[in-house]
């Protein structure tokens, strides 16, 4: 699990006694015993996304900047979580004008009721959240043989076309989507599936995106991916440090960054002692760009890490992706 910034400011026994409990079927147990839906309590309607949510595994606690909700059944949890990932439900939250996603607001949000969308939504939302083995029990509980017959709405080199067919009833590392592009595609398809499940039209989904999500549109308009689905450049303020900077930074060299470009299209000479930015390499049609640096994500000591991007680089069009996914799933549900 990621490192944390907070520890309980009391004896552990006192901390355990303070955990809220829930009573189901005559049994009383701490809410931390189960998987929970958790959302950021404070929201900003002018941000890229308003409603920020995930699922936390058993044993995890949080401070009051978050709100958690426990469900009696895992299927209800996934129904609610899948819906919450969509811009459709995010738009519903924006429309309240509220600054806090409290229990009153969360109780207003829709729960998936159309079962024919369940497998498609669950497969994608579980693949997004099940990054570590802490989710293996939930995966085993939710897994359906229908997961294996899912398909991406697009056939692109950035998308692993065998991802769904390789899913297994027992959680393993390849049950999670790990590339930037595949995770984006899953969210695009969830947007479409939720819109269809709620009876919206494609035009209404596009209008929601165009009018209510200007920051997301701004980021999407200039986020670029390599052939393996890795982001090489993005202006997103939520992804600071991901990819290359727009222009070369001499400070990177002082911080131990080492750049390399291996491409016949490269005319910049030897990269030794040379900083590289997105503007320097965006024209490449073949070859690779790499950077080696000290990564402090997993420990304060850091570790040497190399990130490589494969040219050429692409910029997807979210509106076009919505249109393609809409037609794909509309046909799929009609034939089901």
Go through each PLM region and give its residues.
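S-adenosyl-L-methionine
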Residues: 1-336
């Amino acid at each position: 699990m990621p490192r944390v910034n907070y520890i309980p400011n009391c004896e552990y026994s006192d901390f355990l006694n303070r955990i809220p409990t829930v009573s189901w079927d005559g049994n009383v147990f701490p809410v931390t015993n189960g998987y929970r839906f958790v959302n950021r309590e404070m929201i900003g309607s002018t941000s890229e996304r308003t409603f920020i949510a995930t699922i936390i595994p058993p044993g995890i606690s949080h401070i009051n900047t978050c709100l958690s909700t426990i469900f009696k059944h895992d299927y209800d949890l996934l129904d609610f979580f899948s819906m919450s990932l969509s811009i459709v439900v995010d738009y519903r939250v924006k429309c309240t004008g509220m600054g806090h996603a409290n229990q009153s607001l969360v109780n207003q949000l829709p729960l998936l009721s159309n079962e024919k969308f369940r497998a498609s939504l669950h497969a994608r939302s579980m693949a997004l959240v099940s990054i570590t083995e802490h989710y293996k029990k939930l995966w085993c509980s939710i897994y359906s043989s229908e997961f294996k017959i899912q398909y991406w709405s697009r056939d692109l080199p950035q998308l692993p076309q065998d991802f769904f067919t390789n899913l297994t009833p027992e959680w393993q590392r390849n049950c999670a989507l790990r590339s930037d592009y595949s995770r984006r595609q899953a969210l695009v398809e969830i947007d479409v599936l939720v819109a269809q499940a709620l009876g919206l039209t494609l035009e209404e989904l596009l209008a929601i995106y165009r009018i209510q999500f200007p920051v997301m549109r701004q980021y999407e308009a200039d986020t670029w991916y390599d052939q393996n689905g890795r982001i090489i450049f993005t202006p997103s303020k939520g992804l600071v440090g991901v990819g290359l900077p727009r222009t070369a930074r001499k400070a990177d060299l002082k911080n131990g960054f080492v750049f390399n470009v291996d491409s016949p299209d490269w005319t910049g000479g030897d990269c030794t002692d040379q900083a590289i930015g997105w503007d320097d390499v965006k024209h490449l049609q073949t070859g690779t760009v790499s950077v080696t640096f000290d990564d402090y994500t997993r420990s304060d000591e850091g570790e040497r890490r190399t990130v490589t991007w494969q040219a050429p680089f692409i910029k997807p069009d979210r509106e076009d992706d919505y249109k393609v996914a809409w037609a794909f799933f509309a046909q799929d549900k009609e034939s089901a």
